[in-house]
Amino acid sequence: MKVNPSVKKICDKCKVIRRNGRVMVICENPRHKQRQG
C-alpha cells in the first residue's frame, strides 16, 4: 500500500474507487495498491 498525495492508475487493471471518503486504487497487482492521504 502506497500513500500518495495524488493517486493514479498504473496499468489497465487498476481501478480508482472511493472508500470511506478516501480515494484508493485497487488492482490485481498488489504493488499497485494506493491510498490518498
UniProtKB/Swiss-Prot annotation:
Protein name as annotated: Large ribosomal subunit protein bL36A
One annotated GO biological process: translation
Example of a GO cellular component annotation carried by this entry: ribosome
Gene name, Swiss-Prot/TrEMBL: rpmJ1
Lineage: Bacteria, Bacillati, Actinomycetota, Actinomycetes, Micrococcales
Domain of life of the native organism: Bacteria
Organism: Leifsonia xyli subsp. xyli (strain CTCB07)
Record keywords: Ribonucleoprotein, Ribosomal protein
GO terms of molecular function: structural constituent of ribosome
Family to which this protein belongs: Belongs to the bacterial ribosomal protein bL36 family.
